[in-house]
């Protein structure tokens, strides 16, 4: 066998810099297990179809098993001269078992081989990402259960809006990560199709059985067009897109944790295990983990744009540009998994300052909407009620009062429809618990959602 699998057509050796520039072994070596797994299934199929003998297939499989063991033990030296993981393994196989190893590549191209490897790899990674999402959801759910009844300010425009339960806030993020898990499950369906058998681009002249290989490798089916099979990276783009949404959710939560842990809010305390100090200011406790996750979100967005840009103008079928699919994909996987793992632990160990949350909720006229709703129930159109309460708030600001501190006489100065029962509607508890409809912040509504989430999780176990 020539050193290069394609060297027969060439009269000059590859320039050393070109060799290094075009090699992908430095990053695609992480696919070794999947490359060997796919090759074993391919060898079994070749034997089953009579394309190679059973003895040859067994020799190939035994050789691949020994190579896998070498790599796992760290006894395999990867070569840049052999370009990629596929040729590194094939060259070692031929070196180990002789020319029969060269029969493995019958009815196969590196184009459909790499498409298979990435799908096998990404299939496992999607499962792992979903398991990390489950852990983040569990941490959020435990915080919601543990702190049911704790009232905090809800915000719009980062201005105090209405009182809500802290548990309601945690369950909002639970829903976000729940959708993320659904997206990953949906993407898995499109990943889990076998591209092997497409050859370089047009299929193969050998009587292969793609469905048998798909069954061997646990795929739901086979891809339907050979050109598309080797040129498709939609599944990787979809993963990077869904991963970007995961990171966006983590980044939003990071921003809130950073604010909440500051001295100005002091709603939460992050465990010391997830914070660092300052080299000059001894009092500092910096929320480095959420800050880094917020920063890494941009990195994952960049990976998505990188992959989209690689694919945007490629004619069918395979092009060398597509070698650039792996680094953004691999980096996205590593970043998302790391971020989810650390967040699950950080949220679980976070402690709540319930008194500070309640105190903040009592400021900023958070029950003003409840006053407006009260006036509406007295028969006043909402827009008129809105103006009445707006004037009431302005009066409170001018006289340095909270709404609940107004006397009945002061209330009546703005509307004769306000009676002494107004005070039953403008406590923080009354405001929160009046929002009982599904999805609302009332304790009974939030408790229902926590229970539903618990039931769903039990059913998935």
Swiss-Prot record:
Instruction: Please report a single Pfam family linked to this protein.
Output: Lyase_1
Q: Which GO terms describe its biological process?
A: arginine biosynthetic process via ornithine; L-arginine biosynthetic process
Where is this chain primarily localised? cytoplasm
GO terms for CC? cytosol
| Pathway this chain belongs to | Amino-acid biosynthesis; L-arginine biosynthesis; L-arginine from L-ornithine and carbamoyl phosphate: step 3/3
Report the InterPro entries cross-referenced here.
Arg_succ_lyase_C, Argininosuccinate_lyase, Fumarase/histidase_N, Fumarate_lyase_CS, Fumarate_lyase_fam, Fumarate_lyase_N, L-Aspartase-like
Which EC number(s) does UniProt give?
Answer: 4.3.2.1
Record's subcellular location = Cytoplasm
The family database entries (NCBIfam families) matched by this protein are listed as: argH
Q: Which family does it belong to?
A: Belongs to the lyase 1 family. Argininosuccinate lyase subfamily.
Output this protein's name. Argininosuccinate lyase
This chain's source organism reads Syntrophotalea carbinolica (strain DSM 2380 / NBRC 103641 / GraBd1) (Pelobacter carbinolicus)
